[in-house]
Amino acid sequence: MTQNPYHTPVMANEVVELLRPVSPRLLVDATYGGGGHTSALLEAFPGLSVVAIDQDPDAIAQGPVGDGVRLVKANFGSLDQIAAEICSEGIADGTSIPPCFDAFLFDIGVSSHQLDESERGFSYRRRGPVDMRMDRDAELGADTIVNQWPVDDIADVLWRYGEERLARRIARAIVAARPITDTAHLASVVAESVPAAVRRRKHPARKVFQAIRIAVNDELGSLELGLEAAISWVRPGGRVLVISYHSLEDRMVKRRFAAGSAGCECPPDFPVCTCGRVAELWSPVRKPLRPTEQELALNPRARSAILRVAEKVSS
């Protein structure tokens, strides 16, 4: 599979194989990016129709990667409304709208294009504006957080979304260094605020940039909404696939899939179920999938990726 110059799709082969039993005809790519996953799916499943969603205008500007691709500029936190509108097409008013999608795919996080474009402000390795907005039309940018928010709020973001143990120390340094003029300045302030032993490990700004980016884009809130919508609108026998890149996202996906897979809670000596609980999901693979060494040799950025899948068993 050729690499996409905009964004190299992670575990595209695994995604295709997990969807072969479904033979999807209608699928949502909730994180279109440059269309890497969509391209692989269109090649694998002739006749497939894809609803391709992305909030980044740069991604939408790439255009559809093939026939049958319907582009929607939106955050996947709005997926419930988007799916309802599509599933209701051709259905009379007042009629119950059944789930109509065969699969949903989420590739969570920042794209290669966003990291490599210094003007987007996502990378601590490149000098650019302190921005980090995936949707450039959004009001909140990273500059507001680092240059206007109080210490306590910044520290909360770094701890909550970056799991940064030195959150308060770093937050105080950021406030003291104001105005933070660009991403290189922010990365330098963070590096200088931590002990030398910490600097000798991974770059100390890594978790800080992750945390601020998640806060700016409300990534976890959007994931929660998008995941619920996907489970609601995928048909029985259809699948929901999620590729995540850090523990916060993965824990959310793991817990939701586990909760959906829980069935009857009655004591084992009950002759019949009285709780009425029925599992809505099951996992067709025992363990989450990770990139192969061959893929990592071509795309080292995929190293932290985790792919989970759940299949709908009931409405």
Predicted stretch roles:
Residues 1-315:
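S-adenosyl-L-methionine-dependent methyltransferase catalytic core, i.e., the SAM/SAH-binding region
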